[in-house]
Amino acid sequence: MVNIMEHRHVISALVLNKPGVLQRISGLFTRRGFNISSITVGITENPQISRVTIVVNGDDKILEQVIKQLNKLIDVIKVSELEEKKSVQRELCLIKIYAPTESAKSQVIQYTSIFRGNVVDLSPESLIVEITGSEDKINAFIDLVKPLGIKEMARTGITALARGPKILKPKS
């Protein structure tokens, strides 16, 4: 039976940009038995600091535990949950779609246009499409093109920032 109180949480953490930090974060999740749905890491406007965006599924108790444990790690500067309505959350997906005919290519291009995506590569038998947006938008596009034949796919996982003036920044 699925716990109805369980839902997706997006956690943003500022960490020192140095070797081993991601390993310590993922090790924390492994030791605690928490599953990471997606994780993205990239440098911030300060090259000494990286932003880690982690998506976990669980109830509020799990979220609280994850945030407490992350805050205990020495290289973690600050941690915050990014609520869906109070943040901008995006994912990038590259999809290689089977399209051996002009008709199939035209159909893929039309779908891509509707989803405001881009065709980034074209070969005699396939196209590579770039779709950026919410997880739901990307899943809808995948469902639409699946009957055509997805040859290969890569997703980045979610990255996010708080809306408005709220900023996740190190304490001064």
Swiss-Prot record:
Task: Note the InterPro entries from the entry.
Answer: Acetalactate_synth_ssu, Acetolactate_synth/TF_NikR_C, Acetolactate_synth_ssu_C, ACT-like_dom_sf, ACT_dom, AHAS_ACT, AHAS_small-like_ACT
Q: Which domain of life is it from?
A: Archaea
* Reaction equation(s) it catalyzes: 2 pyruvate + H(+) = (2S)-2-acetolactate + CO2
Molecular-function GO terms, alphabetical: acetolactate synthase activity; acetolactate synthase regulator activity
CDD domains associated with the record: ACT_AHAS
GO cellular component, alphabetical, reads: cytosol
- Keywords per UniProt: Amino-acid biosynthesis, Branched-chain amino acid biosynthesis, Transferase
Under which EC number(s) is this enzyme classified? 2.2.1.6
GO BP annotations of the record are:
isoleucine biosynthetic process; L-valine biosynthetic process
What metabolic or biological pathway is this protein involved in?
Amino-acid biosynthesis; L-isoleucine biosynthesis; L-isoleucine from 2-oxobutanoate: step 1/4; Amino-acid biosynthesis; L-valine biosynthesis; L-valine from pyruvate: step 1/4
Q: Which Pfam families does its entry note?
A: ACT_AHAS_ss, ALS_ss_C
- Any idea where the ACT domain is? 10-84
Q: How does it assemble?
A: Dimer of large and small chains.
Q: Which family does it belong to?
A: Belongs to the acetolactate synthase small subunit family.
Task: Quote the protein name from its UniProt record.
Answer: Probable acetolactate synthase small subunit
**Lineage, top ranks:** Archaea, Methanobacteriati, Methanobacteriota, Methanomada group, Methanococci
Q: Which gene encodes it?
A: ilvH
